[in-house]
Amino acid sequence: MAKKPETLSRIADNKKAAFNYFFEERHEAGMVLHGWEVKALREGKVQLTDGYVVIREGELYLIGCQINPLKTASTHVSPDAVRTKKLLLHKDEIKRLTAKVEQKGYTLVPLNLHWTNGRAKCEIALAKGKAEHDKRDTIKEREGKREVERAMKSRHR
C-alpha cells in the first residue's frame, strides 16, 4: 500500500523572528505536551512571539511560548499557560547546535508551530541578531515591494 503524503498545517508563526534575526539553519523539533495543550493548539490558542529556545544539560527547552487553555478542556488540572516545553531533537543535532550557540551572537529562536502527520512540531532556527541598520533595510525593502505591487495593481485596472 502506498504511503500517504505528508500533511503540514501551520498553527502559529513567529513573524517578529524574521524581522529581528538572520537565519542560518532550520530544524524541526518534536514537542513534549500535555493533553490540554494539544487541544488548545488545535484551536489555535497559542502565542509564539515572546518565545525563545535554551539548551540546558544537553536538552532543548522552549520558554515563553504561551498556550492559553480552553475553558472546557482542562477542568481537573490547573494549567500553566507559559509552561516550559521540552523540544525533541537527535543528540548529534543538539551537540552541533550547542557548539554554534556558544559562539558570540548566535541564538535559537522558534519560527513556527505546525502539525506534521498529526504531531505538533516546532520549527527552530539557529539565528544571528540583526543590527538596527539591517532592520531599517528590511523595512525599506518591504515598503518598496508594496509600492511596486500597488503600481502594478493600478495599471491593470
UniProtKB/Swiss-Prot annotation:
One of the record's GO cellular component terms: cytosol
Keywords: Cytoplasm, RNA-binding
NCBIfam families with a match to the protein in the record: PRK05422.1, smpB
PROSITE patterns listed in its UniProt record: SSRP
Region (Disordered): 132-157
One term of GO molecular function: RNA binding
Domain of life: Bacteria
Designated name of the protein: SsrA-binding protein
Family: Belongs to the SmpB family.
SUPFAM superfamilies assigned to the protein according to its UniProt record, in alphabetical order: Small protein B (SmpB)
InterPro entries for this protein: SmpB, SsrA-bd_prot, SsrA-bd_prot_CS
Protein's cellular compartments: Cytoplasm
Job of this protein: Required for rescue of stalled ribosomes mediated by trans-translation. Binds to transfer-messenger RNA (tmRNA), required for stable association of tmRNA with ribosomes. tmRNA and SmpB together mimic tRNA shape, replacing the anticodon stem-loop with SmpB. tmRNA is encoded by the ssrA gene; the 2 termini fold to resemble tRNA(Ala) and it encodes a 'tag peptide', a short internal open reading frame. During trans-translation Ala-aminoacylated tmRNA acts like a tRNA, entering the A-site of stalled ribosomes, displacing the stalled mRNA.
HAMAP family: SmpB
Name of the gene this protein is made from: smpB
Swiss-Prot/TrEMBL GO biological process terms: trans-translation
